């Protein structure tokens, strides 16, 4: 979203064209409104996107956590550390099953850094210190391989790569699955850190109960 500089939206009421400016402090950002609407307000016919220099340096890691909420605390620490990872996604135990990267007994953190300017050893080292301090386990050899060359492909393999592939394939599975009697969908939300644990538990319980009541079938709900 941060790379979008301007958009042109065709709506039933007319055309909305935003200005091509690197930034503006004049009220709400209309481009955010257009992007977030996901087609409900109109059809995006044009978009200007800031070109980015492809990263030359990459580092990636996946970590396992026996305690899901310890993993959540780890993600909070990473988010507030100033390290700014390019990818920081936490999969709860159920989500690891859907992604084919776990057996449902542990949570998994997918972590990555990218840069065109500098090697990433110091950033990854500090991130892994945070991971370890929260009880996470990772493959040090795999992390080292991910930083072994400027053209590393290690970040596309292993657990992190398997999750990425599953994430990209999921939209293509959704419609065929309906023909097999399986309905899959996602919804997004946000909550403050201090309320996350009770919120997570409540959503899982309430949504599972609602699906079972409506379909008579046991539902599977996961979080990432």
Report the location of each language-model feature.
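FAD-binding subdomain of flavoenzyme oxidoreductases
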Residues: 1-89
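C-terminal substrate-recognition/cap domain of FAD-linked oxidoreductases
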Residues: 53, 59, 63-64, 72-224
